[in-house]
């Protein structure tokens, strides 16, 4: 149990640091580094924990991770009065299937067509799952998040 909690802590810390580093490269506002890191950490933590479910696949884990990070994105965008694109762009970084894309191209170049096709289809499924998770949460009405955070909306001019 202690080993699992230690792994969870390390996963959270590394995903937070990686997302903050990507926020720096992405030129996110300095005041938004910590919320950006929290969105990436939320998405990766849910992804990692979902993989422990019986029968869970990386596609399902990516979908649940995308749901979690987009929920965090919507909450932070209302609470911090900042566009959600700042948080979702940085927060998606840990979930992007970069290794899958790399291995798809590697197998293609090496002439391993069966492995290329299998890895390419899996990578495409993960990418679609992430996109669906983001779209589902972004389709929720904004008033829901304004009420959740306790604000009625942007200030009127």
Q: Each PLM stretch: what is its role?
A:
Residues 91-103:
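Hydrophobic alpha-helical membrane segments
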């Amino acid at each position: 149990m202690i080993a699992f909690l230690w792994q969870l802590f390390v996963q959270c810390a590394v995903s937070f640091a990686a997302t903050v580093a990507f926020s720096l490269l992405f030129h996110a506002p300095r005041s938004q580094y910590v919320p950006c890191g929290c969105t990436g950490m939320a998405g990766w933590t849910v992804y990692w924990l979902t993989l422990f479910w019986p029968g869970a696949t990386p596609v399902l884990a990516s979908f649940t991770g995308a749901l979690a990070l987009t929920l965090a994105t919507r909450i932070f965008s209302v609470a911090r009065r900042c566009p959600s694109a700042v948080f979702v762009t940085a927060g998606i970084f840990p979930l992007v299937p970069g290794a899958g894309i790399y291995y798809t191209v590697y197998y293609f170049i090496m002439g391993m067509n069966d492995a290329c096709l299998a890895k390419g289809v899996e990578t495409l499924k993960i990418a679609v799952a992430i996109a669906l998770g983001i779209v589902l949460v972004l389709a929720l009405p904004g008033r829901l998040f304004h009420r959740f955070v306790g604000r009625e909306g942007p200030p009127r001019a």
